[in-house]
């Protein structure tokens, strides 16, 4: 049998990993064996944190809504319950955005919710 060398394939695979490892510290950006471990771990972190980001942002929106609602003598849970009773269907992301950037609009929503407590 003839000898098969995977020069081009191997070189391209190494280049791909080293390109992903660009900016890493120490040998992790230049040594293939170290770089492949670091890139795999980085991809695991990225996968995990894409899911955690959704969790974190929901918590942030709830904190912002709660802080804005407490200025109007309400608590977050009461406010959300009152919104549901009032038939106002706005998600937390939009409510938090209104609370931060459009206080007049948020106040009108709070007043409508207060009427249904």
Curated annotation (Swiss-Prot):
Question: What is the stated purpose of this protein?
Answer: Binds directly to 23S ribosomal RNA and is necessary for the in vitro assembly process of the 50S ribosomal subunit. It is not involved in the protein synthesizing functions of that subunit.
Highest taxon of source: Bacteria
Q: Which UniProt keywords apply?
A: Ribonucleoprotein, Ribosomal protein, RNA-binding, rRNA-binding
Cellular compartments per GO CC = ribonucleoprotein complex; ribosome
Question: Which SUPFAM superfamilies does this UniProt record tie to the protein?
Answer: Ribosomal protein L20
Instruction: Set out the biological process GO terms recorded for this chain's protein.
Output: ribosomal large subunit assembly; translation
Q: Which Gene3D superfamilies match?
A: 6.10.160.10, Ribosomal protein L20
GO molecular-function terms, A-Z: rRNA binding; structural constituent of ribosome
Tell me the disulfide pairings in this chain: none
Name of the featured protein: Large ribosomal subunit protein bL20
Which InterPro entries does the record associate with it? Ribosomal_bL20, RIBOSOMAL_L20_CS, Ribosomal_protein_bL20_C
Write out the similarity annotation: Belongs to the bacterial ribosomal protein bL20 family.
